[in-house]
Amino acid sequence: MSESEHQNVGRSPLGFAGPLSLSMPSFDFWYSSTFWLYLFLGLWFHRYFRLLVHCVSHWTYKSKPIPSKPTFTSKDVTVVIPTIHNAFEELRPSLESILACEPAELILVTTHDKRKELQKLADSLVFPKVRVLDTPIANKRLQVCEALPKVETPITIMADDDVTWPSTLMPWILAPFEDPEIGGVGTCQRVRREHDGSWSTKAWNWLGAAYIERRNFEISATHNIDGGTSCMSGRTGAYRSEILSSHDFLHGFKNEKWRKWILNADDDNFVTRWLVSHQWKTWIQYEKECEIETTLENSTKFLYQCSRWARSNWRSNWTSMVTERYIWKQQLWCTYALHFATFTSLAFLIDPLLLASCWWGTADWDMQNRRYAFWSQFVFMFAFTKVVKLMGLFIRNPTDVMFLPVSVVFGYFHGLVKLYALITLNMTSWGSRADGDANDEQRLAPAPQPSIVLKTPPGKGSLIRYNARQKGRQTQAQQVSWEKSDYASYDSSTSYVPIRVHTPMATTPIDTKLYTNESSNTCWAI
């Protein structure tokens, strides 16, 4: 082979091999220790940089202090609790803890068939103002919407029927509202611990407690950085009544769409996104005096709860990042650390890949340093990253350390739960409670189709455009004039509203449902 032929080996006839060879790594690079080292560093930064930042942010988090002269007191608060419980007497301890905080009113909302039983419980409570409402079906969004228009106080607290409040909660949860830009306030939470029962019951109970503890860690950290969170918990949250009682909110709350369906699940996610899209700030009061207690399943039913939460996260985070996109400008760190992490945090894939890339990436090192690097990563992964978010649990109950291996194993299994939730996004059932799925088909109902006269025809145009008098294209001046005029619109919360449309197209319809206004060159859809 001549020297010129040897130089041309591997080159394309068009001479593109040169630029490609400069811009792309060689084939051997993908199997080299350098590639694995780069991969390790990239994965490590993505997985642990936000954790280290969150550690500092969480440890330095400060709740809003109680003002000496508060703008709002407990008498400015109405508590709304939707419930479909089968044994209302079991709600008494929770309701009494809430009434001990002395709100102005407590509104309970259930279904038609359960109203009498709930009314008996309400009448037995020693409190001057407890109101019971009902809806035709069991659906949290519809039940909440039944109560919100009847709220007469400036602050509304929405709560679940199984939470227990400390008597000190009210002044702490109201303190952030001294800032007029704050629209919603959440609390820290803990799970009611089971100290009796079998070891498996205690283990499931601890997994639920660990889930809530991690959530406390994350939302306090992100709020301290940019005031963001992926979801304000529906277990207990305080909001300005002007937000929740507005027509736009109520309509959107009852008519949220997920793909081609009306979504009546994920209510707390909707409220959170609504606050963000309307430039309201949120806050979390991370104080013992503002810590509510809740209950989770202490058996395999906990897996149903995890899958339901995971579906909500997939749906809501996709809506936040892709459909609405307000978070990109308002909560950039939260977008990266919480929303984007939903799509990338699969520990059962990332952790083994981190250890493997650490080992293969240090292949050129001497064996002693190579082992030191590997075991340093191993200890950091399992002794720090798997523990730091749970320190609150271990401080309160040091014996919980025995459940740490259970937490690690479940963390890997939870990645599979997330993938299962991803491929079953259209499921909205609770699965974990017998009374939770009475009207499950209403949680994801087909969205109503618009009238045929309102549909956009095939083609590049976005509206049907008619012009009865002018047979040619409108002039530019006419188009500008039209753009400056008012439009009538269609409101899905009402019946048919005339839609005023114009067109530069030379089309004259023949339709008995269309009335042409000859004087204004417009057409009205009736």
From Swiss-Prot:
Coiled coil: none annotated. Disruption phenotype: Severely impairs hyphal growth and pathogenicity on wheat leaves. Does not affect adhesion to leaf surfaces. Leads to constitutive overexpression of several transmembrane and secreted proteins, including an important LysM-domain chitin-binding virulence effector, LysM. The keyword Secreted applies. Glycans are attached at residues 298, 317, 426, 517. Keywords: Cell membrane, Cell wall, Glycoprotein, Glycosyltransferase, Membrane, Secreted, Transferase, Transmembrane, Transmembrane helix, Virulence. The chain crosses the membrane at residues 25-45, 340-360, 375-395, 403-423. One of its GO terms (molecular function) is glycosyltransferase activity. This is Type 2 glycosyltransferase. The gene is GT2.
